Amino acid sequence: MSTDHIRRPIRRALISVYDKTGLVDLAQGLTAAGVEIVSTGSTAKTIASKGIPVTRVEELTGFPEVLDGRVKTLHPRVHAGLLADLRNPEHEAALAELGVEAFELVVVNLYPFSQTVESGASVDECVEQIDIGGPSMVRAAAKNHPSVAVVTDPQGYDGVLAAVSSGGFTLAERKKLASLAFQHTAEYDIAVASWMQSTVAPEQPETDFPRWFGRNWRRQAMLRYGENPHQQAALYADPGAWPGLAQAEQLHGKEMSYNNFTDADAAWRAAFDHEQKCVAIIKHANPCGIAISEVSVADAHRKAHACDPLSAYGGVIACNTEVSPEMAEYVSTIFTEVIVAPAYAPAALDQLTKKKNIRVLVASEPQDGGAELRPISGGLLMQQRDQLDAAGDNPANWTLATGSPADPATLTDLVFAWRSCRAVKSNAIVIVADGATIGVGMGQVNRVDAARLAVERGGERVNGAVAASDAFFPFPDGLETLTAAGVKAIVHPGGSVRDEEVTAAAAKAGITLYLTGSRHFAH
């Protein structure tokens, strides 16, 4: 028969907390229920200051707190009381022989290590906030959950008092508390280990990739389903990470879906790939349109939508600047799943929230740098995020392979086309006119098909436009598809064994061809 439902009365509690939130109410409640309280340092002082009976830990151990408080509870008379399995008669006999009393409750929270690091404190100050005794007590109590309940979060204090009044926690409840406690110390240890690793020279100075890395992921939301209705899904966030889309504030609309998040992330990154006012419209993680404008964000949105209005239906929109009332008015006429921006004009927000189904998000600007992680079977791939910071992303470093140098307007469009390529799944061809994509060929397994798709999408607008390819043309056919449609200038990385043939085809067509020397695959 299961004993999970049997309650173990709480007669003695050990309390040692840095965060004093709710401490006095907890101590008063425990005392009123007849629970003896043993405590340490400032925790004991806070409890005693309210006239609540408390036994200081040094009275228990017969050993003073020493080394500026580094040693308080690291003593056999404390840990024997935490680790004794009261189901074991030999353990009970050992306690009696030693004159040690067991604890049935441990309430501990830890020094604020992560907050200290984030504050910019010195190395020595951070080291002082690495808790030793606290995690030791938490882990001991969690290990011994058949006999001890452990609580590490002040939000759990009401549950403690409720359990005390009901005869104690059940074994099932202590197991749950132990699980939470081990999660707490694991998060703490990851934070300490990650910081400590960052303070020492890497084993391989030529790489930014550590031998070990850890992350703290907390479930932030359950999602309705995953990519498909038969798949379950959830959103996780790293509390210590730079605020991003996972921390976006939703101002309006129904809950976000898995696909909403993936498309919004792609759109958000695409919009911030450009310095001018930019709007990106994404569907299935690929652009329906991207555009920039020196005039207004509404103008950028109009141009982005015009790239592929059919595909933009039900898409996700991202802006790198405040959404204006004019843009919001246009967006409200189109079925849109999500719009995300750093800010909204009040009138724009009023307009958008009249639409029942659109999800309106405010998010912080994406952080530069960082790493991308991709799970694979049995492992994880890590790479530096593609931030358009390669040497070839600067047009000053481009090589003119053939044709006349581009005039300023043409060069501006070429740069925009090149930067927009990063947001398109490979193989990618982007055709641009007047700061807007007009034809996008994406996700094709050969480059000539990507060129054909981009030309088909662009139609008559392609004549006189410019184009970019995210990787080199392996054969002249892709470039010839573009020039036959009227593209006047092209930028691509170069590097193919057939570069001379490709350049010759460009010269024959009389167009301008630039080489970047950098590639922007996206898979």
Curated annotation (Swiss-Prot):
It holds the Pfam family MGS. Keywords: Hydrolase, Multifunctional enzyme, Purine biosynthesis, Transferase. InterPro entries: AICAR_Tfase_dup_dom_sf, Cytidine_deaminase-like, MGS-like_dom, MGS-like_dom_sf, PurH-like. The keyword Hydrolase applies. Pathway: Purine metabolism; IMP biosynthesis via de novo pathway; 5-formamido-1-(5-phospho-D-ribosyl)imidazole-4-carboxamide from 5-amino-1-(5-phospho-D-ribosyl)imidazole-4-carboxamide (10-formyl THF route): step 1/1; Purine metabolism; IMP biosynthesis via de novo pathway; IMP from 5-formamido-1-(5-phospho-D-ribosyl)imidazole-4-carboxamide: step 1/1. It catalyses: (6R)-10-formyltetrahydrofolate + 5-amino-1-(5-phospho-beta-D-ribosyl)imidazole-4-carboxamide = 5-formamido-1-(5-phospho-D-ribosyl)imidazole-4-carboxamide + (6S)-5,6,7,8-tetrahydrofolate; IMP + H2O = 5-formamido-1-(5-phospho-D-ribosyl)imidazole-4-carboxamide. SMART domains: AICARFT_IMPCHas, MGS. One of its GO terms (molecular function) is IMP cyclohydrolase activity. GO terms for cellular component: cytosol. Residues 4-152 form the MGS-like domain. The keyword Kinase does not apply. Belongs to the PurH family. The IMP cyclohydrolase activity resides in the N-terminal region. PANTHER family: BIFUNCTIONAL PURINE BIOSYNTHESIS PROTEIN ATIC, BIFUNCTIONAL PURINE BIOSYNTHESIS PROTEIN PURH. This is Bifunctional purine biosynthesis protein PurH. It comes from Mycobacterium marinum (strain ATCC BAA-535 / M). The lineage of its organism: Bacteria, Bacillati, Actinomycetota, Actinomycetes, Mycobacteriales.
